[in-house]
């Protein structure tokens, strides 16, 4: 005889904004993190159990608006956490926190689904040997290389090229690593999310004609959504990425924009649940919540999840608990500079401000390390000389300093690169530059082999051979 599972039924006893208190029959309390379904006046609202209050009551946080709900409404325990679709059918689509498509392209035909709350991989599954994740972007690979399965913080204000850099990384991982990407918009502006989607379609990162050939799945929890949705949308994106790593055994890029909004939403939920706030009004569980998310982003023997997280720094205060807690998990930082963007040097990655724990001779090799250090010291010297040049002019510098400035300006321009996703706007074909070619090119500039070439020959080219042939044309 087939067993028929009877769902636990409860009823709402109190509503405080997005927080609901729900009473269940004796001995039938749902577990913490279980998804509950509440039948609202217009649609079914999903909540997640956050606390057990005693007296057969639980406190849950709603994932959508609680407008129209009243006491006494029936609640059903699903018996499991929020579960989302995963796999190839998710590519090219936009989802909300519950894994429901929000792009008006119909339902998802996915046979597989996973709960958003899962344990991090065990020690025995982890890939511990540090290896470089080649992006094909010169400035990143050479000066602040990414770790495979590492976490990278992307710092940059509005209009310096964060979105274009993100799209180029999505494009390059698909071409060079055969991997896919998942984009988690956490507390995003809806307009920005829509712009990103349209730009991805334009640059063919999302193939609108054949969605399965797309390279990215998008998960959005926008600014206007309740804090519960913004707090969990990062986990939804991560769960989709984990499937590609564990089942499809692929290298995955996970973008979280913005990790600060994840903390902010957690802080709102914490206050609504009545917890005593900690430093600067943040939740007392800040480090635990951040750790639970970050520990699942890692390399296993099957594949890797490399995460790039945009970090908003409130009031530019790096000691604020939110960015400070994030820094503890980062392997590299990519800082975008407005002054480089103003010069027209794209990607506008600050070569002196960006850092990486991977830039050690024991990991990247002595040649790569010494080239990177020489580039940094040349650019640093150029930076120190800029005030003198502004006041007295270039002619007042010593012969050595003039040579340093000339090489630094060539390096600065050679760090720029035409992007595949920007072909539509620039008209220049995109270039993927291998690390080997980057090192060779910069060593030639540093060694003085190319001192007679004009500096504009180095602007927006791929490898050094292109710069040399461009110089021939400029003559």
Swiss-Prot record:
One GO CC term, this protein: mitochondrion
CDD domains on file: ATP-synt_F1_beta_C, ATP-synt_F1_beta_N, F1-ATPase_beta_CD
GO function term, MF aspect, one: proton-transporting ATP synthase activity, rotational mechanism
UniProt entry keywords in alphabetical sequence: ATP synthesis, ATP-binding, CF(1), Chloroplast, Hydrogen ion transport, Ion transport, Membrane, Nucleotide-binding, Plastid, Thylakoid, Translocase, Transport
Pfam families registered for this protein in UniProt: ATP-synt_ab, ATP-synt_ab_N, ATP-synt_VA_C
Highest taxon of source: Eukaryota
Family: Belongs to the ATPase alpha/beta chains family.
Name of the protein in its database record: ATP synthase subunit beta, chloroplastic
